[in-house]
Amino acid sequence: MTATATVIELTDKAVAQVRHLLGSTPGHRGLRLRIGVDPGGCSGYTYKLALVPGAETGDVVLPQDGFDVVVHTTGVDLLRGMRVDYTETLTSSGFTFANPNAKSSCGCGSSFGSSDDPERTAGRREAAANRSRRS
């Protein structure tokens, strides 16, 4: 396993798969792995992975074994301490995420909720208040 500046940890299998993807992508020289989150999914945020040509303004660049991982500063706190693995079974394969900041997640593992999400917290409070009014 390789630690990426203590923000994100990629397992050896994840590193090998990223290297494989980079090697099979035409013009792969200089590509980076972007890891991020977008609002959405059934739990609040969805994980996002992409091979990108370079870092953008506001990105944190995390050197990895043979490639760079880039994370936008707005996602760093949601991803800090996350472990990315690559798993293969007879029926599926893909990257998996173990995120200590995820307070809830969906069944597929692609979406998570965080206690730091003020809109979700406010929404839960409002829903609870509506339920108690109906009781």
Swiss-Prot record:
Record GO terms (molecular function): 2 iron, 2 sulfur cluster binding; 4 iron, 4 sulfur cluster binding; iron ion binding
Pfam families: Fe-S_biosyn (PF01521)
Segments of skewed composition (Low complexity): 106-115
UniProt cross-references to PROSITE patterns, sorted A to Z: HESB
Chain segments carrying region Disordered: 106-135
Bias (Basic and acidic residues): 117-128
GO biological process: iron-sulfur cluster assembly
Entry coiled-coil feature ranges: none
Entry similarity comment: Belongs to the HesB/IscA family.
Protein's name according to its UniProt entry: Uncharacterized protein in nifB-nifU intergenic region
Provenance organism: Frankia alni
